[in-house]
Amino acid sequence: MAGAAVLRRSARRIYRHLAAAPAFSRSVLQQPKRLLSSQSSPEHGARGAVSGSELALYPPERVRNFSIIAHVDHGKSTLADRLLELTGTIQKGHGQPQYLDKLQVERERGITVKAQTATMFYRHVSASQDSDTPKYLLNLIDTPGHVDFSYEVSRSLAACQGALLVVDAAQGVQAQTIANFYLAFESNLSIIPVINKIDQPTADPDNVKDQLKRLFDIDPSEALLTSAKTGQGLEQVLPAVIERIPSPPGKCDAPVRMLLLDSYYDEYKGVICHVAIVDGALRKGDKIASAATGRAYEVLDVGIMHPELKPTGVLYTGQVGYVISGMRSTKEARIGDTLHQAKSTVEPLPGFKPAKHMVFSGLYPADGSDFEALSHAIEKLTCNDASVSITKETSNALGMGFRCGFLGLLHMDVFHQRLEQEYGAQVISTIPTVPYIFEYGDGSKVQVENPAALASNPGKRVAACWEPTVIATIIIPSEYVGPVIMLCSERRGEQLEYTFIDAQRALLKYQLPLKEIIVDFYNELKGITSGYATFDYEDSEYQQSDLVKMDILLNGQPVDAMATIVHNQKAQRVGKELVEKLKKFIERQMFEITIQAAIGSKVIARETLSAMRKNVLAKCYGGDITRKKKLLEKQKEGKKRMKRVGSVDIPQEAFHELLKVSNSK
Amino acid sequence: MLRLAFPLVSHLPRTKPAAVRPRPPLARRYASSASTSASSFSPPPSPLLPPPLPPASAYVHLPFCRKRCHYCDFPIVALGSSSAPSPGGGEAAEDPRIVDYVQLLLREVSATRPVSDDGVPLETVFFGGGTPSLVPPRLVATILDALRARFGLSACPEVSIEMDPGTFDAARLRELVGVGVNRVSLGVQAFQEDLLRACGRAHGVKEVHEAVGIVTACEGLQNWSMDLISSLPNQTQEMWEESLRCTVDARPTHVSVYDLQIEQGTKFGQMYSPGVFPLPSDTESANFYKIASKRLSEAGYNHYEISSYCKPGYECKHNLTYWQNRPFYAFGLGSASYINGIRYSRPRRTKEYAEWVQKLEDGTWCHESRSSDMKDMALDVVMLSLRTAWGLDLQSFSKSFGKSLALSLCNTFKPFVESGLVIAMDMDRRALPHIDFELDLQNEDDFGSRVAFIRLSDPDGFLLSNELISLAFGIISP
């Protein structure tokens, strides 16, 4: 899912922020409350305690672990809600829609950022054995959908044996459908195509079946037709899960070994890990160890998510649930790690990787004095999002702040939004950048996560520069192919594929420098395709590029927070645009201001902001000086909010605005 | 930072010789056109006097207008065009609204307790509006009588009244002078028919010339001010030059030049945004300001305050009260007083004002507005004194608010002394080269050995006064 539509939603989100500031404080205030109430809230389908002996009734062959994957808005969350209701896990009409998306940012954007699991019990009337209706234990593993989290997705999928591939019956296959399909396919999952929203007047399930056949070689007869909204066709879904998805393959008698899917920090319970038991059984009181860190823990509590924490004291092979083991920070709970019986050597499960940070930006308190508050907020948020890298940095313009590394754009965006929504932090972020590699004539190499840290005049020859790239998939109605090709080539893209997925729609694949898409690529793409384009990307390798550092100078003083790395051929254009933008957003001051973009000591763009002409209040009417004084006080406060470099005051908006330029035409 | 217990009133040169000097002789009226002398602020400073506690000034608000001008956001009462006063203003023509209001105002005057019992009389009275010239002279007299009875009037007080062209004739003005008015502030605003109409003024150019004729011919009235507005919609440089020429030709003793402010809630506020056509651009309107400064200086006027010019000795003493942060009474709708260190603005609506007067009489009103603290006081002093050509007296500022604060202020202004927006002066009010100024700032002990005053330059510093003063605000109240 996400990449595309996620970004589309960010505009909506901004309006919401403007219109509904209270929503903000509400979320901050109510978050802990919800956590509290969720532990034993009766409306969430509390079935009483599920005992360990009950779980023993579900050997691996009675367990199915599956995930739902879809392009954003194709109905994944609604389908999940329906399945939870159908199995009595939650009660219909109780609890909030999009049950598994717990974060405000997930609900607003319709995306999943954190993996969630839910255990359901389902009595299956098998077609073949009409006498026996055994009960099955079904684990729905809700995964993040976006490429930023593709590692997390791959770990979640690794705990599944099958996936429901949900496709909107009217919109058909979109960019993230393709990305998700391949992730599931590469994880060897059984895929059940679900063509959803068939109640729509424009639904064309046959066309979608054709697309599935053409793109994924899926037999049209395998597709289930549903409407999660009206309930039509839903009765086929769980039987298909049981019949078409294999049971988990683990060894029941082996020492316990489990995959860590995701973790949360709970103020009261500490770190809660979601795990899938691959081999053996896990009991309360067991000693377990992490393969990644070697640290050992005692299992303090273990249970299933039904749909909230339900202690069972045990989890058996193939089952999915939670473990609380006295970990103090989610940094100890690395996604994809193998937890195993302590003091035994086990083969770690494959695929574990440390987080890879692809997008970096500086985060600074909007109000310079608030560094401590921001620091506190970041610390708390990283308790729940260990995948962000944080290092302190100082800027001449913005003061003390943090250099943050993110998995990708969406991750960065979500991090910002959570900082604001859940912790009330007001931040200025610098132009996002990617990890470039510069190699010098003397053979030394540096990875550049902050352009300001790169010497403008290094005193030695730059031998080569590399930048990360992505493979982007774009699906568009065919009439937009021309402009999209033009956009991609402006962004230094290289075409890899150009095919038609049906009579109206084209699929384009491009290799693009990551830097070229991190700022405004998607907005532009949406703009030139009347909103029809869907877009997704995956990381690709580094490529050698002709890169230069561009400084922005105000009255000769470089503004470190505005430094950026650009492609040599685009430097002139980007520089010109940046200085023009700055000229617009920096207010006239009592002296002339020159705004320059420079590469090394060579100025490539320049604007002059002439001195302010007048700012005078002519009259103190009838001795009433209070109004005038208020005005001057306001003016003073305005100055206080400015960031200052040398003698030049820079309004915060200038920093926000610069984020919008860096790449566009 | 604020070391001394600060007297509630200003430490600024409170009494200028001009303020106690008798009216300048008639012969002097135009005598000084050549005196565009070194200091634009003609009277030399007098030594600091002990803080004078009781106010010696009173502002009286007379809110009536025929109609509201398009730029105006004052507390006014529009009477409508039918109530143009009959020349001579007999009893029969008196509008009951005016009579009732004056009654109310008189009640306020008598319910106001003088600050001191030892009878410091009023040195200045200012009838502002609205259009005070719409109020029958008989009623103006009753107000002056009430003020005299309550607070006392000095031997030769300055009694100013704002008058609009078209609202008075020679007889009426004579009557006003007869009851004690001795200074007129004539609201001309422009000399172009189109501009007057566009502003929603209730008079035309013909009335302007008539009014000027009446004022200049009036015996016993030597002191009058012409009020102009620059940066009006569609105003061109030629028009502005013409207005200034007409002004100089009319030979007022005082000129007030107001740069149009677009206020929210006014008709102009709905129609225009500052700096956008048909309003002149910032550059043009800055230019208008500079032209006024140039033309009026050439004609012998001192630019003694951001928007005020006068022939030597003809400063508006009442307004000097404001700029020197001295206390003043105020009476009437929406008016603001400054008594015992407390600024208070009266209700802007007639009904609320009437209720307020009632409470004042009953003794049940006590104001919520807190007395200003030292910081506020310092802000006021800086804000007001930097409006004047006299500038900020660093010595007395240091005395009241501490040397280090004065030094910080000077340090903040350092680049602007260098660029010429701010002028540093020695005891003799000679401008200091910025090198000398900077030398003075090297350490606190030396500070003040050379520099004694800072002021904003004319016209460039004045034009950026808000910026410069708000910089100072940032130092005083970070």
UniProtKB/Swiss-Prot annotation, chain A:
Keyword Mitochondrion: yes
Stated role: Promotes mitochondrial protein synthesis. May act as a fidelity factor of the translation reaction, by catalyzing a one-codon backward translocation of tRNAs on improperly translocated ribosomes. Binds to mitochondrial ribosomes in a GTP-dependent manner.
Enzyme Commission code: 3.6.5.-
Transit peptide, residue positions per record: 1-35
BP terms from Gene Ontology: positive regulation of translation; translation
Gene Ontology molecular-function annotations: GTP binding; GTPase activity; mitochondrial ribosome binding
Binding site for GTP: 70-77, 142-146, 196-199
Catalytic activity: GTP + H2O = GDP + phosphate + H(+)
Stated family: Belongs to the TRAFAC class translation factor GTPase superfamily. Classic translation factor GTPase family. LepA subfamily.
Predominant place of localization: mitochondrion
InterPro entries linked: EF-4 (IPR006297), EFG_III/V (IPR035647), EFG_V-like (IPR000640), EFTu-like_2 (IPR004161), G_TR_CS (IPR031157), LepA_C_sf (IPR038363), LepA_CTD (IPR013842), LepA_IV (IPR035654)
Pfam families: EFG_C, GTP_EFTU, GTP_EFTU_D2, LepA_C
Keywords: GTP-binding, Hydrolase, Membrane, Mitochondrion, Mitochondrion inner membrane, Nucleotide-binding, Protein biosynthesis, Transit peptide
SUPFAM superfamilies per the UniProt record, alphabetical: EF-G C-terminal domain-like, P-loop containing nucleoside triphosphate hydrolases
Keyword Protein transport: no
Stated name of the protein: Translation factor GUF1 homolog, mitochondrial
Cellular component annotations (GO), alphabetically ordered: mitochondrial inner membrane; mitochondrial matrix; mitochondrion
Domain tr-type G: 61-249
